[in-house]
Amino acid sequence: MASVTFRDGFLCVSALITFVFVFVTGADFVRFVSFRAINHNLSGAAPLCRDSVPWSVALRDGVVQKAVAVDVLLLVVFSLQHSLLAWTPVKRVCQSVFGVLSRSVYCFTTAAALQILMHYWRPVTSAPCLWSVSSAPWEIWFPLICFIVHFLCWAIICSILLIFDYPELLGIKQVYYECLGLGDPLLLKSERAQRLYSHLRHPVCVELLTVLWLLPSFPLDRLLLAVFLTVYLILAHSLDKQDCAYLRHQLRNKLQLFSTPLEGSEQTNDNNKLE
């Protein structure tokens, strides 16, 4: 049995802390971007906006301007962290400094930047909403529809993360392979898979965009969040024909894999009948 060194223990604890922190941050983000806004409509709390105030007056309000400035600054900080650490020269420096923990460091700092964004986010309540569903019976039904759609989108996002090897995305697999002396797990994948992973940084674009834009009430701060993240996701999308062909090939293989046991069991039953 291989002995566990202090270094191995440190790597495992660091990766585990990162996993827990990212998981908690993900749950907080779901509540921040989705269910808190929908629950606000269902609970009948104070309105998110002041529709009686004209836009010309609201945009000159110092409180609105300060809140918008803070929110834009938070979004810029998050995007800089998320993009700068994914830049190839910076990735090489992180790899040389942190080694096998470089992916965990990236995920940890991303979660930290997201926590800062959510904690210091300033709702803009002194400006009108872009839209607000407040007429009966849609004031009840539309938030429920949004809740169901959001729930389905988050379920799809979780399933996609499972398909895309989430232990590797969070840096856990790298540490596990390092402790066993197996090397980098990404190098064990095919070149086409490595190419896809390098291009598909955000495999949940459609679902996340649906969550960002589908709400019963759409205040100004939500517009900032939705527009900024939409532009960021579009700019980060770099799939080409080869990647799409590889995805179609993998989907075809998965469908064949699921159909093979069924066909095999049917053939076995037929053979048993013949015997």
Swiss-Prot record:
**Cellular component per GO, a single term:** nuclear membrane
Membrane topology per record: Multi-pass membrane protein
Q: Which InterPro entries match?
A: Nurim-like
Please identify the protein, giving its name as recorded.
Nurim
Which of the residues are on side Nuclear? 1-4, 86-102, 170-196, 240-275
Membrane-traversing stretches: 5-32, 64-85, 103-119, 139-169, 197-215, 222-239
- Keyword ATP-binding present in the record's keywords: the answer is no
Q: Major place of localization?
A: nucleus
Compartment annotation: Nucleus inner membrane
- State the similarity comment: Belongs to the nurim family.
Keywords for this protein: Membrane, Nucleus, Transmembrane, Transmembrane helix
- Which intervals lie on the Perinuclear space side per UniProt? 33-63, 120-138, 216-221
